[in-house]
Every structure is written in C-alpha cells, then in structure tokens.
C-alpha cells in the first residue's frame, strides 16, 4: 500500500526526530545539522536518573514510593513514574530525563497499540525502565511500533475521528492525522528537553 500523500511529510519529520534523539542518547555520533559528525557518549544510569533541582519527579522503584509532591508511581514492574491524579500540581514539578523519556516511550507504545494493536493497553501496563540502556532500547522499540502503526493508515483512516483509541488524551475527538501531527510535536519538544538535560548534566558541578 502506498503512503497517503498527507502522511509523507509527517512520517519524514518523525523519522528525522526519532533518529536524532536516538543518536543523542546512544551515540557514538550525532549529525551536527550540517553533516559534520559530533561525538556523543552513551547515556549513563547516573545521568538518566539525575535530579538537577530539589523536588524532581522521576522514575523510581515502587518499593521506595513516590517522590516529593507525587502520590503514586504509575507503571508495571519494579519501577514506576511519579504522578498524581488529575489535576496535576501547579506549577508543574521539574521532571528528570528518566521521567521525560519514560513518558515519551509510553505515549508512543500505547498509541501504537490503540491504533493497530489490541487497543487495550493502559499506563498501568507500561513498564518504566530503571536504567539508561533499557530506557533507550524501550524508546526505540516504541518508536518502531508507532511507525509500523502509521504505515497501516490510508486516506480514509487519516480523516477518521477517534481512529486511535488512546485513553489519556483527546484522541477520541480528533481525526487521526491530527494525532499523527501531535505525536510528532511530543517527540520534537521532549527530544529537545532531553538533549538540553544532557548538556546541563555535562556542564553542571555535581561534586
């Protein structure tokens, strides 16, 4: 099946942003933007869980309980992500690289399932990663699943309201092409945040 013309630029943008974030996390190099490779060291566990300010929300062991201001650790397995029931605190707590990458991975994986899978997964089924290597691998797998789901879409699907049944957003009220656009925005802005946190970690005095 050929790609719907409207999907082509969105898929191209997704592929670019996904590759750029993966390279920024795993290395060994990253395209500087003009074709020049820049050396990148792999994300470490210490960096993954680094809390640059007091009161961060992060990914934590369920056995340790939620962090400051959070009331629950959401997710299956040994680790969960800090959160509260809606409405969330104002101002929003600062979130760690681990929190942001976990959130991004979850939204990709769950939306893939609610587009071309069982349409049943929830946040309680998602397993947050407690170490950097597992988190990067989980992100890559979730991005691959979302991309595969996009390849099932035709022009009719793109215009279908509620085609993606993801339960934690406005997907039920939106045509699918708007969900595809929104996921790209999530990837772009969280990817930029994650890249900045890597820079801050590199240059911050921590000892």
Spans of features found by a protein language model:
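Short, contiguous alpha-helical
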Residues: 1-125, 164-207
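Acidic/histidine-rich alpha-helical segments that form the ligand environment
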Residues: 127-160, 177-188
